[in-house]
Amino acid sequence: MNRRSERIWIEFIMGSRKTSNFCWACILLLGSLGFLLVGISSYLGRNLISLFPSQQINFFPQGIVMSFYGIAGLFISSYLWSTILWNIGSGYDRFDRKEGIVCIFRWGFPGINRRIFLRVFMGDIQSIRIEVKGGVYPRRVLYMDIRGQGSVPLTRTDENFTPREIEQKAAESAYFLRVPIEVF
């Protein structure tokens, strides 16, 4: 969703609250709970899960390994659920021609750097750069080159843009900022 006028352009960035992240977090949580229950049932000698009789799985070594995988999966799942809860990576890009300032805001992990805020003068922006990496999983990322500060990504690296979409986005950004486009 974008808000745009002649002087101000605000582009909202979607964070980690994507459908794929929800699906992976649920699958990982359920799978790791299954592994942990099988490991615990092999330790107790009872059938906590009716699909696997505890007599078929010995606690040493299969039950220990299943418990380890279950605990590791719970840690990874809790990490995914935390990023979804905190909506890591979400924010906005605000381009203001009237004041001549570009503001980039993103949410990070809790702590000192929870709010990532970058403010740049439009005069310091050298160009809009498209970086294209081909292969089996092609990657197209849009960067804003800033004099003396390097490059700042304007798109997520995991977004799969078609060549037409990335070119259009680069052209819109370059036209609004009145800077050239570079392709690498």
From Swiss-Prot:
Compartment(s) where it occurs, according to its Swiss-Prot or TrEMBL record: Plastid, Chloroplast thylakoid membrane
Keyword Oxidoreductase in record: no
GO cellular component terms given for this protein: chloroplast thylakoid membrane; photosystem I
Cited InterPro entries: PSI_Ycf4_assembly (IPR003359)
Annotated signal peptide: none
Transmembrane segments: 22-42, 64-84
Mode of membrane association: Multi-pass membrane protein
Pfam families, A to Z: Ycf4
Key words, A-Z: Chloroplast, Membrane, Photosynthesis, Plastid, Thylakoid, Transmembrane, Transmembrane helix
Gene Ontology BP, a term: photosynthesis
Family: Belongs to the Ycf4 family.
Function of the protein: Seems to be required for the assembly of the photosystem I complex.
Name of protein: Photosystem I assembly protein Ycf4
Organism in which the protein naturally occurs: Piper cenocladum
Phylogenetic lineage: Eukaryota, Viridiplantae, Streptophyta, Embryophyta, Tracheophyta
